[in-house]
């Protein structure tokens, strides 16, 4: 198999044109190609009048492939990634806390090793969780144990289901292949910016859970970690809270994949004197535009092309005040969702289904902040800042989980909005006209305003006065890092405790969290064989 890079394909390409382009690149006859398959595909939209797909194609030839590679600088022998599944040794069943991407993939790898893991999740299974979330979005009745943050699949379940990642870890291919084998569409294997969509992601998550159970694992929903027992700096047990009361489970290995919103767990870990440090994160708001205008700005006359789909964007700028402003978790053809999980506090996120065909497109507009901006040097000071901003957003929205919104023109002029333009907010249960300048810190407001203006020069219409800001976006990443060793991935203080994933400060998104879960599982399996 040869991997051929830099193949340019038109938007209306078919299998025949792919074969022809590969033959031209390799300088061979088309009949020499037995088969070809796109390995990676991205959109090159730098020239709006000449948009094309830039692809990498895997081709199988019926002639000597090594000779062909030597004469073609854009090709090499393709090496298929094969994951080495280890077997579990003689040790008690490990426990995985949290059924987000990190926890699910950790439990899956452990189950395949024969470890019979126990996966506990404070929220509900994805079907009951979906019903709880939909009820909240329509009625404002928040369930603090089952919501956008807590439940099977983690916070990423109600998102765009993005599967791109900055990590170069070879395990990310493993994660994508697992998603496909559990029901995700094949295109996530080759799209440069793959996404599943919240509708398809739910079924995939259930299939992973079912395999864990079939392999001997145990999955416990509505089960919350409330304490841990140590002796001589070694993990000995955990205490869980269920509907039937508290229970102590003896174990010497726990993967702590709790997610970025498990604030009461952060406080419990701090009380147990586990080493935790405050880390930088970002705050801001969701910004919402008409999808057709974003598509036009990105794709010009090609807007609406079915193969292109709804347009994505990723913008960033560095300001004179030293702060960075950037867009994050862009949801083409999606909606802004109420992601609240605590009583009397409100935060937002973005979500798309697989089709990405809703009226608006949105993204987070964020300002980077660091521990120097926090109100104290407490390890949980960033978390307390999040809570403060979310409490202010709750009050600004009317104290009923309606979200505070503001037109961009009004935000730039520091005045409360009184009407909408052509962009209608998509968030539920409802919204309240507000002035986000009165919710967010002054340094965030100033930076967001400057960023909007500068980004309007990068993407036509980004600074449209009728675009809608919805507040607040405060949970793009964890505000803490639970310290761990670089070699064993165990807590720097407690042997057998593995801080893992986004909540622990070691990932940022579905793929990187899943990869971290796999790595922690591998460490436990390795230790079981010593």
Which residues does each PLM region occupy?
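Residues forming the flavin
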Residues: 1-53, 57-158, 162-530
């Amino acid at each position: 198999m040869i991997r051929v890079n830099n193949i340019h394909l038109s938007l209306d390409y078919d299998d025949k044109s792919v074969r022809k382009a590969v033959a031209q690149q390799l300088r061979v006859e088309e009949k020499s190609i037995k088969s070809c398959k796109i390995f990676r595909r991205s959109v090159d939209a730098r020239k709006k009048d000449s948009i094309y797909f830039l692809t990498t194609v895997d081709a199988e030839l019926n002639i000597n492939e090594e000779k062909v590679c030597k004469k073609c600088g854009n090709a090499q022998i393709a090496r298929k990634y094969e994951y080495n599944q280890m077997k579990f040794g003689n040790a008690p069943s490990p426990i995985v806390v949290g059924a987000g991407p990190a926890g699910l993939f950790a439990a899956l790898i452990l189950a395949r090793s024969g470890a019979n893991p126990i996966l506990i999740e404070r929220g509900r299974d994805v079907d009951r969780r979906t019903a709880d979330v939909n009820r909240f979005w329509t009625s404002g009745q928040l369930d603090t144990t089952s919501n956008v943050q807590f439940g099977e699949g983690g916070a990423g379940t109600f998102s765009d289901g993005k599967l791109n990642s900055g990590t170069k870890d070879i395990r990310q291919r493993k994660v994508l292949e697992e998603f496909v084998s559990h029901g995700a569409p094949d295109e996530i294997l080759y799209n440069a910016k793959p996404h599943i969509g919240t509708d398809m992601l739910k079924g995939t998550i259930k299939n992973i859970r079912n395999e864990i159970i079939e392999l001997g694992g145990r999955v416990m929903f509505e089960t919350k970690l409330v304490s841990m027992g140590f002796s001589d700096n070694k993990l000995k047990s955990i205490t869980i809270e269920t509907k039937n009361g508290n229970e102590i489970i003896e174990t010497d290995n726990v993967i702590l994949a709790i997610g970025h919103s498990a604030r009461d767990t952060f406080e419990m870990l701090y009380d147990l004197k586990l080493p935790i440090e405050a880390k930088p994160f970002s705050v801001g708001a969701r910004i919402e535009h008409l999808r057709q205008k974003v598509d036009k700005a990105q794709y010009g006359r090609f807007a609406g092309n079915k193969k292109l789909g709804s347009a994505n964007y990723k913008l960033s700028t560095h300001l004179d005040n030293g702060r960075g402003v950037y867009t994050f978790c862009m949801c083409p053809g999606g909606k802004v969702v109420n992601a609240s999980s605590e009583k009397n506090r409100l935060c937002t996120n973005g979500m798309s289904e697989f089709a990405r065909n809703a009226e608006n497109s949105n993204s987070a507009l964020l300002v980077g902040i660091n521990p120097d901006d926090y109100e104290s040097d407490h390890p949980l000071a960033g978390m307390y800042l999040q809570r403060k901003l979310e409490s202010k957003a709750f009050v600004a929205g009317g104290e009923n989980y309606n979200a505070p919104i503001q037109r961009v023109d009004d935000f730039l002029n520091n005045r409360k909005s009184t009407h909408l333009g052509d962009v209608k907010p998509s968030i539920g249960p409802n919204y309240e006209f507000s002035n986000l300048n009165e919710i967010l810190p002054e340094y965030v407001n100033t930076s967001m305003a400057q960023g909007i203006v500068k980004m309007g020069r990068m993407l036509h219409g980004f600074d449209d006065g009728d675009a809608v800001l919805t507040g607040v976006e405060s949970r793009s990443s964890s505000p803490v890092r639970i310290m761990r060793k670089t070699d064993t991935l165990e807590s720097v203080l407690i042997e057998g405790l593995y801080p893992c994933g986004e909540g622990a400060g070691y990932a940022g998104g579905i793929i990187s969290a899943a990869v971290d879960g796999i790595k922690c599982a591998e460490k436990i399996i390795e230790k079981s064989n010593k």
